[in-house]
Amino acid sequence: MANAKNQQTLSSLQGSLQGIETFYVVNYQGLTAGQLSELRKSIREKGGQLIVAKNTLINLALQDGGRDFGDALKGPSALVLAHEDPAGVAKALSDAAKKNDKGIPAIKGGFVEGNKVDVKVVERLASLGSKQSLQAEMVGVLSAHLSNFVGILEAYREKLEGENA
């Protein structure tokens, strides 16, 4: 690994992984350059980043951060980092695989919030929806309950005023 280009790539990978708690490893083999470019764009829109590198370098960078990926790093692999919205990035990967008749990119696994996860967990995460949509749903549920509570208090206040009159 004395190659200067490999050293530079490893340093870049280590820097990119610094502070990242959620990332996925995917097989991208079979995507055209245009499809790969489109995938990068959709991942970037969700606050993520796709990095293609040699498995050996990916493995070294992960081990440097105390994360071991072992068997998943076989065949062509790319790292997909989730900077902002882990579910949104997972959904972008899932949507891209559904568009492709070969099911590529194929998710091999990942780390979510620092915990190693398998393909099924990443697929479930992708089905959740984006962070913003989940937050909007939560706000809607809370505001509906608050509105009901205010209505109950108003009815009780009117009842008390009626008794005092």
From Swiss-Prot:
Q: Which GO terms describe its cellular component?
A: large ribosomal subunit
Gene Ontology BP annotations: translation
Q: Please indicate which superkingdom the organism of origin belongs to.
A: Bacteria
Q: Does the keyword Repeat apply?
A: no
What keywords does the record list, in alphabetical order?
A: Ribonucleoprotein, Ribosomal protein, RNA-binding, rRNA-binding
**What family does this belong to?**
Belongs to the universal ribosomal protein uL10 family.
Biological role = Forms part of the ribosomal stalk, playing a central role in the interaction of the ribosome with GTP-bound translation factors.
Q: What is this protein called?
A: Large ribosomal subunit protein uL10
**Record organism:** Deinococcus deserti (strain DSM 17065 / CIP 109153 / LMG 22923 / VCD115)
Which gene carries the instructions for this protein? rplJ
